[in-house]
């Protein structure tokens, strides 16, 4: 502390601060009873009084005794006094776990004479324009919110919106307190249509929160998924939050408190915790809470969908079914032309900025994403639950078109939402969605060719990411009319032109990645082949000096050694061939659709198999040489475990790449199945049914 500076708190206040910090509320009370001035003066750096701090004790008796220690005039001032952000006593009480704390405040409010009363405590706002009710909903305190709502003197719906149009329902949804949001929506249905300062309704806000829904939640792994599906919420969830408390108005005590009989509301934390899985297993409890959030979010979405009619405003006037053919016949000329136009636009923009020009906006400009309806937003976010509920309740909503001529299929395709795409394919109106051309002249081909909304997928390498992009393009090509391939957008580019331009950087990175990977793996494969080739001539146990045959020729372990050595050699050489074929390929864009990723997956599969066989060969060699029959059995088990340890490490490090092998084999099986004539499959099926019929008849 420099000269001239003094501490802003006296010794008594600092003693009281230390008592509050250590949780010694008895000493805290004793100090304040000796000097009641501290009760209404600033107690900390946030401008809280000692009574504000006393709410942290969660002790209604302490709060009541401190308020009773004040004169009547000072008591009313203490109830209304705010801290540095104007949070009053009720604003701070919402953090308490017992509603008795708020009951104490409401009791003293009733005792204030009429001439001293001003605005009710529940209507006082802080610097953000939030009442205690608003703040309770914003922080997910459902129990306290319900209790305070019972003591509101005016219509509580007047307290649900801040001065900046931000509603209490928006705040609870943004905080992911969906049980609170459901209760609020059942209290005031008009909140569903309320728009915030950005023009967003609550359903639009929820449509931009994909991670709170099961369809877009992060992957949890096989074991956690199994626990997720096996965990039941029936006895806890299906009594909805608005039914979770039973309020008995006749059982209030002398303090004006209300007896809350808990039935099944999880938010309060009053239920028998021994019955909850989270009380016994933390891991299961975390999964259970996630499932609860998914179910609450889905239920909230259903309630909001019932009150959303934004899909009725649709723009079909500018529909252009005519195909615009390219002016320049050469693809390279079209790409050069668009690059030239971009450079011209960039130069003009720099000139305008240097002269302090401002861009002219018109009513026909493309709207911001906030003007998309919840249906289109949910489709772009991949939230299957919302899209399904909207289309199920309003079947005609699937034909909704935005101002920039986007429909639900366009949003799903350009955001690469496969679940939405597959869901729409089952709908009878799917063919009509396919032919839509946007205001910028873009077909579904153009949408999938652009990387404007591309999000990097969880794939092991750039080559597989490029393969996924090409697979999307192929998926769209199967459903779009063939003549759309020649259609040009407003820039005069076909979909193939856009695909090549937008994916040029990814194509370059994919070439470098797959080259380096193939070179590294081919080196490992050659080393494995060298080892197993040398092992074939280094016979364990040696040979018979009389006839040159191996000493252990009649042993089963020796036969096992021979087979695994040969298989390891063949597998390693096949993997070398696969990697060399990758290195000698031209690396064209469409080579990354099937050829190169398929070769890489097979190369990895054979390399891993050769490593396993090499370790098996080594195990057989050791067993033949040391003869573990004369030792304990546990030594053999320990040895075999040690042998496969490096194989397990290699598999764990490269596991994402081996997952691609599984996908490759599935697609290979699907391709082979498609190659079989349909008549043969139908004939086999009919023959099977006929045989089953005769057996049943006899």
Where are these regions (language model features)?
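Membrane-interface segments at loop-to-transmembrane junctions
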Residues: 549-561, 591-607, 634-641, 672
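Acidic, Ser/Thr- and Pro/Gly-rich low-complexity regulatory segments
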Residues: 1-522, 526, 537-549, 579-592, ...
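Transmembrane alpha-helix detector for multi-pass membrane proteins
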Residues: 515-545, 559-588, 595-624, 646, ...
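C-terminal interaction modules of eukaryotic adaptor/scaffold proteins
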Residues: 642-646, 656-659
